[in-house]
C-alpha cells in the first residue's frame, strides 16, 4: 500500500509585499540564495553579524531586485555582509506564515517545557519531520547555515543563544501575537531555536530518508512476534510519532474519525495544517484531535516494543525465566569475593538489570545511525566485559524450580546459577565456606561453592552473658525470707572496647524492660571506662539500690510501684583489678560475689546533700561517661524508683554555718535569732520527674534550728543580719532628702523555743500580725548586701517605682504611702 505521507503536491505561495509589488514565491529560493552568499563571503567570521544593522540603501536595492525576479548577487562584496544579513531577517519576518507553521507552534512550546533533554530532542526531530515539505526544506537550509556560526562563535561573537534571540521572533511565532502570550512564550521560542541550532547534526539525520523523496512505503501495523516479545529492527519506521490516547474517541463516517480507547497506542502518520493528526491503529486510519493523545517516546513502550540488538555469541544455558517482585533496600557486598551465598531461610532477591537505552532518550548528535535502538537485558555471560555484574549461586529448594528473581538460571551440582546482573537489596551473610568444590567445565570456578548443611542467618555477634532476670512478685505476695540471687557467670569474651560497646548497648536496651538487672556495671560505665578504672589500683564502685527505669511514670499503680521499688535495697560491689590486668581476658577474673536482696518496703525517700562552708552544694549525678582521671571516684548513690511516683516530699538540707549579728547590738554579740527562709512554691527535678514539697533546714553544729513554712506574703517576718560570702549588690538609688521618710522597723518575732521540732511551722503571734496589718507594712525578706552599715536609719521607698526601675530591693521595710 502506497500512500502520500506529506501533501507535497500542494505548494504554498508565500506572498511578500515589497514596495507595493506582490511577489509570488513558490520555493524558498531567495532564502537559499542569501544563505549561500553569506557563507561564501565569510559571514560566519564577521563580528556582530545579524546584530549590526546594514546599509539601508543597499537593503532596499536587494529587495527591489528580488521583487523583479533578479537573483544575481555577484556584484555585492564582503562589505555588504551586514546588509545581506538584514535582508535575510526581513524576508523571514515578512513571510505570511513562518517556516514553523502556526499549527505547530503550540506543540513546539509544549515540547520545550519537557525536563528530559533526550526526549525533547527526539520530539523536536519528529515534529520537524512532520512539517510540510517546503517548510522542512527551508528549515534544513537555514539551520544548517546557522549551525556554522556556533562553531566560529569566538570570532563572530554570536553564540547559539544570541542567534536564537534574533531569529526566534521571525521563524517561530503564534498567529495572533498578544502581548501577554508573547511575553510568556518568548523564552520558550528562543529555547527551541537554540536547541535546533546546537543539535542540528542530530536533527538533520532525517534528511537522508525523506528530504529527496516525496512518497514512502508505510506498513499499517508493526509486526509483533509473540514468542520473542519484540519487533524487528528493520520494521520500525522512525519517521512517525507514537502517541497514547488519553481520551476515547468513537468512529464517525462524516469526519472519518479514528476509533480508539483510552490507553491505546496510536501511530501518527501526518500532522495536518489545523494541528490535528492522521493516525493509524490496528490497520485503521483516521483523523484524531491533538488534545485526545499525548506524544510519548518509544522507550516508554518497553513492554510491547523491544528492539533486538545485534546477535552476540552466547553460551549454552538453560532458559528458565522466573518472575518475583523486586524488593528495595540497601545492602553491602563484599569486595573480596564475587559470589553471594543465599539459603532457603533468607528472603529471595530479585535480579533486576538496569535498562541500557540507546533509543530516542539517549541520542546524541554524534550517532550516525538514524534508527533508535533499544538494547535488551543482556546476560553477563554473553558480554562479561560490557556489563559489570554479580552472579549468584542459589541453593536448591525443596521444589523442582527455585523461586528466585526473574533471570536465567542453570542447575549445577552446587545449585542454581543465575546469569543475570543483580542489584542486591537485602543484607547477606558474607561468611566464606570452609570447603570448596573443584571447578567444573560448565560454569566458572569462582562461583562453584558447595551448599552448606547449616543454616546461615544474618545476626549480630553474640553478646556477653548476663545474670538471669530476677522475678519480683507483687506487693501483695511479698515473701518474708530473703531471696538470694544466682552468681553471675564470668564473661567469656575479652574486655575489648568493641565487646564493651555491645554489652553496654544491649544492657541499655534491656534496662527499660527489666528493672531487676539495672545494677549491672555496664549500665553505668561507659565503653571506655574500663581503661580508666583499671588504671587505678584497688578502686571500687559501690552501687546502692537500683536506677529507676524511664518507662515508669507517676500514674502507675501502688502495687507496681512497691514491687519495682522493692529492689532498691540490693547492693552490688564490683572490684576492679589494677593496671596490670587491663589486657588480661575476662575469663581469668574471679566470679562476682553473690548478692542478697531483701524485699522489704523502702524507707521514706530522703536526699542528703553535703554542703561545705563555702556555700557550694555538691551534686552527684550518675552519668555514662567517667569523671576526669584527676578526681577520685565518688560514692554513687542509686536513687529509688519510687521517686517517680511521689507528688511531694520533704527534703532536709543542712545549711552552712552562718554567723548572725544583731545590728542594734553595740557589743556585737551573737543574736540567737536565725535566718527564716520562706518558699511559696518550689520544685526539684530528679530523674525526669518533678517533685514538690516543703523545705526545712537542719540545725547546724553549735547553732540553733531554723524553720520555714508556707506563709502569707503580707505576714512575712523581717530580719536584719549580715551574711558573708555573698556577691556585692549595686548601690541603692539616690533619693532626694525631702522625699525620705523614716520609720523604725518592728522587731522580728521570737521563736518559742530554740529546741523546737524540725518540721514545726513558725507561728507569728496574733498581736504581731495585727500590728503589721495596722501599720500597712510590707516586709521584704531579702538579704542585705555585704559590708553594709545600717546602724541608725531605715530607708522607706516605693515598691512600684522600685519594680519599674528594676532596682534591687532594699534590706529594710518601707511604707507604700
Swiss-Prot record:
Keywords: Cytoplasm, GTPase activation, SH3 domain
Subcellular location(s) of the protein: Cytoplasm
Single GO molecular function: GTPase activator activity
Biased composition (Low complexity): 318-339, 359-391, 472-498, 534-568, 577-587, 607-624, 735-744, 752-771
Gene Ontology CC annotations of this record: cytoplasm
Swiss-Prot/TrEMBL site (Arginine finger) positions: 51
InterPro entries associated with the record: Rho-GAP, Rho_GTPase_activation_prot, RhoGAP_dom, SH3-like_dom_sf, SH3_domain
Domain SH3: 238-298
Bias type Pro residues, positions: 461-471, 625-635, 725-734, 807-817
Residue stretches of biased makeup (Polar residues): 340-358, 396-438, 509-532, 705-722, 785-803
Signal peptide: none
GO biological process annotation, one example: signal transduction
UniProt-annotated stretches for the region Disordered: 318-638, 691-771, 783-817
Domain Rho-GAP residues, every copy: 20-204
A Pfam family recorded for this sequence: RhoGAP
SMART domains documented for this protein: RhoGAP (SM00324)
Role of this protein: Rho GTPase-activating protein involved in the signal transduction pathway.
PANTHER family associated with the record: RHO GTPASE ACTIVATING PROTEIN AT 16F, ISOFORM E-RELATED (PTHR23176:SF129), RHO/RAC/CDC GTPASE-ACTIVATING PROTEIN (PTHR23176)
The protein, known as: Rho GTPase-activating protein gacII
Organism: Dictyostelium discoideum (Social amoeba)
